[in-house]
Amino acid sequence: MFGKGGLGNLMKQAQQMQERMQKMQEEIAQLEVTGESGAGLVKVTINGAHNCRRVEIDPSLMEDDKDMLEDLIAAAFNDAARRADELQKEKMASVTAGMPIPPGFKMPF
């Protein structure tokens, strides 16, 4: 099934990939992305681990409807989370490049 040294090479590749993925996950957790809603009136900045770092609200919204403001904050957070997920996929793709991973396989991170 495995050629000469094939299993050993496969295990070595898997270990190297795991180490690269761990390092990349640590880097991603430190990155910050900002999501926006209401044409930039509300901005939410989160890190790669989806922890909220900052919320910015344009002063003009403080006089408006509370429900609308809450919706805008939620939308901005969701936008930031989507951007963080996309960034994570891009970064991890560079780690798994060349590995025989089936299409659509969801990585455990």
Swiss-Prot record:
Which key words are in the record? Cytoplasm, DNA-binding
The UniProt family comment states: Belongs to the YbaB/EbfC family.
Source organism superkingdom: Bacteria
Enumerate the residue ranges of region (Disordered): 1-21
Q: Name one GO molecular function term.
A: DNA binding
Say where the protein is mainly found: cytoplasm
Q: Name one Pfam family in it.
A: YbaB_DNA_bd
Its localization reads: Cytoplasm, Nucleoid
* Signal peptide (residue range): none
Q: Which GO terms describe its cellular component?
A: bacterial nucleoid; cytosol
Name of the protein: Nucleoid-associated protein MS1507
**What function does the entry list?**
Binds to DNA and alters its conformation. May be involved in regulation of gene expression, nucleoid organization and DNA protection.
Q: Describe its partners and assembly state.
A: Homodimer.
